[in-house]
A protein has these predicted regions:
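Short, solvent-exposed loop/turn segments at secondary-structure junctions
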Residues: 5-9, 20, 128-132, 168-171, ...
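A donor-sugar binding/catalytic signature common to diverse glycosyltransferases
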Residues: 193-240
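Structural alpha-helical scaffold elements that stabilize or flank donor/cofactor-binding regions
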Residues: 116-117, 182, 199-203
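Catalytic donor nucleotide-activated moiety binding site of glycosyltransferases and closely related
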Residues: 149-191
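Active-site donor-nucleotide binding/catalytic segment of nucleotide-sugar enzymes
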Residues: 116-151, 166-169, 271-274, 278
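Leloir-type glycosyltransferase catalytic cores
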Residues: 23-67, 239-318
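A nucleotide-sugar donor-handling region in carbohydrate enzymes
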Residues: 23-133
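Active-site and donor-binding regions of nucleotide-sugar-utilizing enzymes
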Residues: 1-31
């Protein structure tokens, strides 16, 4: 049992019963802390906006100089930490590689989402930051993102495009060669990472991700979407789990028609997700300082007690 954000709305969380965060613990009894909103607004999660602010700061000269100073002096390092990288050279090599990738990324041709692309038939795929649990744990066996892109591209009709959008947090993680290999495929278009995913979703024929929120957003907006991993938002009729067998046996238009055959189920899903989630922010102080406010801690504590009573009804949980 682990608490985690439900992403939409971003100020609510649920308790998941599996390590893949695909199964939500369902509350049988109505509780006093279920002050649920009547409508769910699809918007970019708060944590993405916070991350983008931190990323912008991290690319300034002052921040890079401070990182270099901290690396040389190592005054922040706890040498009793068993997870600490012992090789100074290995750490330095990794950091130099990341900074080099960030600078070289500027030379990768990326397109704005303008009318020339908007009027095309396209599939949107958003990249994950890697390594990260969302793809290496939740998306196990589909963690090779380049292979996923190749497999999807092979299933596209000749006149369709595959739009690829980099995760802003991941800039510097992938080498320039990753992108140059992708761009050899004439069907692939690399979209500027600062473009709004919500705007791109609006005209997409299909949205695909390993386990990302973008598929959740698309399905809530009535756009067909698919995830390679099992997710709790596969309960939405317009968000299906995708496999290699699906790509092998059907082309993309056939997959879209299959997804559209399912009812949207958005109203039922909204009621279900709100009934089984709680107000509160599950995060860390760096990503979202609001998580350690007394008001939020009280909300999270109440939710934990509520779920505890649900699991062990006879227990005297105060």
């Amino acid at each position: 049992m682990n608490p985690h954000t439900i992403r939409i709305p971003s100020d609510r969380f649920a308790f998941f019963t599996d390590e893949f965060q695909s199964k939500i613990f369902e509350i049988e009894k109505e509780t006093s802390i279920h002050t649920t909103p009547t409508e769910i607004k699809v918007s970019a999660p708060d944590y993405l906006q916070l991350n983008n602010t931190l990323l912008k700061k991290s690319r300034t000269f002052n921040h890079r100089a401070k990182k270099l100073y901290n690396f040389i002096t190592r005054w922040k390092k706890d040498f009793n930490d068993p997870t600490l990288t012992t090789s100074h050279l290995r750490t330095l090599t990794k950091r130099i590689k990341e900074e080099l990738n960030k600078e070289l990324y500027r030379f990768i041709p990326r397109k704005k989402f303008d009318e020339s692309i908007r009027n095309e038939k396209y599939v949107l795929l958003t990249l994950h930051k890697q390594p990260e649990a969302s793809i290496d744990v939740i998306g196990r066996y589909y963690e090779d993102q380049e292979a996923n892109i190749t497999n999807i591209s092979r299933s596209l009709p000749d006149n369709w495009k595959l739009l690829i959008k980099e995760h802003t947090n991941a800039i510097g993680d992938r080498s320039i060669f990753f992108f140059t290999r992708l761009l050899r495929d004439p069907a692939i278009v690399l979209i500027d990472e600062n473009e709004s995913s919500l705007n791109i979703i609006e005209n997409a024929q299909l949205v695909i991700t390993v386990s990302g929120t973008v598929a959740y957003e698309a399905a809530m907006k009535g756009i067909p979407s698919a995830t390679f991993a099992d997710t709790f938002f596969n309960k939405l009729g317009l968000c299906k789990k995708l496999t290699l067998e699906d790509l092998r046996n059907s082309d993309i238009p056939e997959l879209i028609e299959h997804i559209k055959e399912s009812e949207s189920k958005s109203h039922e899903f909204k009621n279900w997700i709100l009934r089984n989630s709680f107000e509160g922010i599950i995060s860390d102080p760096i990503s979202n300082p609001k998580c350690i406010t007394s008001h939020n801690i009280e909300k999270v504590s109440d939710a934990i007690l509520t779920v505890g009573r649900e699991i062990i009804p006879s227990a005297r949980i105060q």
